Amino acid sequence: MFNYYLQKVVKGENLSLDEMEQAMEMIMEGKVTHSQLSGFLVALHMKGETVEEITASAKVMKEKATPISIESGELMDTCGTGGDAKGTFNISTAVAFILAAAGVVVAKHGNRSVSSKSGSADVLESLGINISLPPSSVERCLKEINIAFLFAQDFHKATKHAAVPRKELGIRTIFNVLGPLTNPANIKYQLMGIYDPKLVYPIAEVLNNLGVKRAMVVHGSEGIDEFSLSGKNKVAFLNEGKIEKLEISPEDLGLEKYSIQEIQGGSAEENKRIILNIFNGEMGPKRDVVVLNTAAGLYVANKVNSLEEGINFAQEIIDSGKAMKKLEEMVEFTNFLSLQAKTS
């Protein structure tokens, strides 16, 4: 049966929602050989994945994931695709702490490095946070401190069947966009950066199909998967089923323009220092890019009425020490939960 789907995409034909769901089920259940899967992923990539194909794949991946249940359905994620090969520091990870300090409940979905030397999991670990907590502890983090890290490899065990072909292929595949679309918690708000400008609007459509209420999907100037300070950012804003195309520049919001070189990161240890410096009051482009992305997150989460208001609020959270306090709280609480699990 899988060969039928393979032959269709090789011919450049699109799969229906049902067909893609069935194909993805077979992949996630390990019923497809590495050769078949490699051919399928390459053919999909060559023809271009459709909204239906991405939606179907994300639905299956979410169904196969270890679920997280929390009474509040107003959770937010700041997970981007990575894969932009620009080597920026962990901007969306820094943003998550500021959002949580502002009262947004953040279920930060993430993994080890994709395009940089440090993924969100790497830098959080470097900051002293316990990143491998069981679902019950993750739920406690969300309820008690407004922020939790959902380590993708712990929650998406079924993706192991695709790991070898993906690594051997070494190219972008549908799995590169699926990570941010498959948060195991019930996400209603999302700030999602993406490496490909052509995918900005389609991914907003996918998020709508998956039940997200409000989201911003952004492809930053100079190709980063975040809002950039270097020029116009291409944005799709999803608001209760309606999608609006926007272009947002830092100058429009009273921020200075900086090149991408000014927001470069490095190893997990270097990125840890950058985040701590920002939270300790260091000014400059690294702080500004975090503030800009946080403003977008606050706007998406209905905490402010405009991006300008979001910028002021984000700066207040940093300057008051609340962002640093939230980070310290997460370090303390995740390690307490880990110790509790070992002694019980």
UniProtKB/Swiss-Prot annotation:
Mg(2+) 2 binds at residues 225-226. Keywords: Amino-acid biosynthesis, Aromatic amino acid biosynthesis, Glycosyltransferase, Magnesium, Metal-binding, Transferase, Tryptophan biosynthesis. The keyword Iron-sulfur does not apply. Disulfide bonds: none annotated. Pathway: Amino-acid biosynthesis; L-tryptophan biosynthesis; L-tryptophan from chorismate: step 2/5. Anthranilate 1 binds at residues 80, 111. Transmembrane segments: none annotated. One of its GO terms (molecular function) is anthranilate phosphoribosyltransferase activity. SUPFAM superfamilies: Nucleoside phosphorylase/phosphoribosyltransferase catalytic domain (SSF52418), Nucleoside phosphorylase/phosphoribosyltransferase N-terminal domain (SSF47648). Signal peptide: none annotated. One of its GO terms (cellular component) is cytosol. It comes from the Bacteria. Pfam families: Glycos_trans_3N (PF02885), Glycos_transf_3 (PF00591). Mg(2+) 1 binds at residues 92, 226. It catalyses: N-(5-phospho-beta-D-ribosyl)anthranilate + diphosphate = 5-phospho-alpha-D-ribose 1-diphosphate + anthranilate. Catalyzes the transfer of the phosphoribosyl group of 5-phosphorylribose-1-pyrophosphate (PRPP) to anthranilate to yield N-(5'-phosphoribosyl)-anthranilate (PRA). Homodimer. PANTHER family: ANTHRANILATE PHOSPHORIBOSYLTRANSFERASE. This is Anthranilate phosphoribosyltransferase. It comes from Petrotoga mobilis (strain DSM 10674 / SJ95).
